[in-house]
């Protein structure tokens, strides 16, 4: 059995995480399917730019899991990366693409009350921890 691979990015701006509301009325991290010939790091950066208008530098892998999309009874491998806004981007408001109903910036505490898959919560918590510890650009071992 094979599964599609979705590469997602956790982006923080001023202690708020960037999330997008999808057509299932859930909040999710920006990102998309890994295409042939593309590295996961390239995928994260170009998907975030397409979906929000923000340019980022891709950081370390945060998590990987198999996600069951119950509404359509399918499984997707999700890989999350930390991502850092490029210089000058923190002054721009993110803009939701046609793929999403809404874009939002949420505090770590606010994330707990959102309809959001558990794997995304783990990734967000991991990136907050690494960012506050000053290790956001360190590669994973």
Residue spans for each PLM region:
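N-terminal strand-loop-strand
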Residues: 1-27, 56, 60, 85
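Generic short beta-strand segments
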Residues: 62-66
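Charged phosphate-binding loop/patch that engages nucleotide di/tri-phosphates or the phosphate backbone
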Residues: 121-141
């Amino acid at each position: 059995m094979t599964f599609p691979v979705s590469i997602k990015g956790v982006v923080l701006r001023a202690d708020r995480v960037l999330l997008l509301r999808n057509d299932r009325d859930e909040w999710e991290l920006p990102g998309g399917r890994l295409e042939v010939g593309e590295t996961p790091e390239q995928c994260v950066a170009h998907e975030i730019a397409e979906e929000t208008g923000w340019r980022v530098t891709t950081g370390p892998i945060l998590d990987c899991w198999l996600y069951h999309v119950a509404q359509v009874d399918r499984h997707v491998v999700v890989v999350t990366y930390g991502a850092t806004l490029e210089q000058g981007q923190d002054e721009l408001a993110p803009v939701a693409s046609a793929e999403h109903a809404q874009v939002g910036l949420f505090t770590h505490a606010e994330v707990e009350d959102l309809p959001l898959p558990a794997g995304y919560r783990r990734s967000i918590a991991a990136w907050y921890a690494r960012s506050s510890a000053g290790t956001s650009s360190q590669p994973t071992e």
